């Protein structure tokens, strides 16, 4: 049915008897409307925040408090009281390079109203997993001289900070990360800890801690307050920032803001591309609110000298920055996830593939195929951008391997010039070699058209959109379609750039 032409004017034309019915879903009370996003401000956040104030503990107290936590974890009596102790131990983290604590400070007067003085629940927290298999101990337990109190205190607080990751991670994460936790403690502090080497957990035990964090808003508030304090206080060149980055920041920041997180990751690799241009390349009709929110973040929050509360605010209220969540931007999320997988170095395990996000896995196969096409198109736009920008960022080998010469600025007329000369002759070049074959889920291999109009591609880079023509029917005997010049010339001005290609 793709060959049927749909006139432009019919898509917005109402039937005569329905002209006054212009309501959209959000304007019909009984419709299944989305939960509205809450506008983020620090003032709005503080009205919802309560946290436990953490005070300094000496080394022997840290050791004795940890012993009590271990007893409760082992006995299955772990409660909010023990969870509070875990938070206190975590945020008594010692600085790795000098004396003092990373997180302990006098709470400023504009935050003191959020300190809780309520009594803490002592009811045991239920486990949500039944697996009682112990995590592997990969380091030998030290023998000989007993571990000194200072080293033990450092190791306990370091471990408790890692346990705070359960705010956003599953118990299996701690099980598999325990080896790297031991290794990084050694590299940061220049010490080996018998306590840290000997520690073991089960998923069942860790699930109680995770369930406690999810149950008690005071725990989440405490984690939020001290993490945002450290992120706001320490610069990236500070050694305290480094230890916090490993233990907490990289895991907790931008939680639930998948769209923004993946855009930043991609921009790090495509460092010559401005964020506004990247958004122009990847936006779609359903992403309007996400684009507005990203502009809001860039303009008001994600800049030097601004409190970092916004990065962790969804721990307090998950309706903050809701418009950049994956569920509200499934197509853009899938597009960015694929681009991240192909161009951004990934971790290991469950987090090695950003396409494992649940909403992407649930996408229809046909929609995934369209995403794959758009991914290839964005990659081609990026390569063209590097070359057409006329900078030295695209080296000789890079440009030659893509069959394109570095352009003389005179060759590429400006967008305004092109519009002023609609009848000028267009210059066509074939990509040599042609673009890489795109592997689709139905295992058919089809190619995007290798014929491009340089001027219209330049317009596309600037955000000018062309009408997309219906795709041709593919002969059963061929898996490769090359557009005829007549079809390419159908659009006004003599050029059609059809990103579908099949």
UniProtKB/Swiss-Prot annotation:
Disulfide bonds: none
InterPro entries linked: Rhabdo_ncap_2
Cell compartments where the protein resides: Virion; Host cytoplasm
Keyword Cell division recorded: no
One Gene Ontology term of the molecular function aspect: RNA binding
GO CC list: helical viral capsid; host cell cytoplasm; ribonucleoprotein complex; viral nucleocapsid
Primary localization class, coarse: virion
Keywords per UniProt: Capsid protein, Helical capsid protein, Host cytoplasm, Ribonucleoprotein, RNA-binding, Superantigen, Viral nucleoprotein, Virion
Region spans: Disordered: 415-445
Pfam families membership: Rhabdo_ncap_2 (PF03216)
Family: Belongs to the nucleorhabdovirus nucleocapsid protein family.
Subunit structure: Homomultimerizes to form the nucleocapsid. Binds to viral genomic RNA.
Function: Encapsidates the genome, protecting it from nucleases. If expressed without protein P it binds non-specifically RNA and therefore can bind it's own mRNA. Interaction with protein P abolishes any non-specific RNA binding, and prevents phosphorylation. The soluble N-P complex encapsidates specifically the genomic RNA, with protein N protecting the genome like a pearl necklace. The encapsidated genomic RNA is termed the nucleocapsid (NC) and serves as template for viral transcription and replication. Protein N binds protein P in the NC through a different interaction, and can be phosphorylated.
Protein name stated in the entry: Nucleoprotein
Protein source organism: Taro vein chlorosis virus
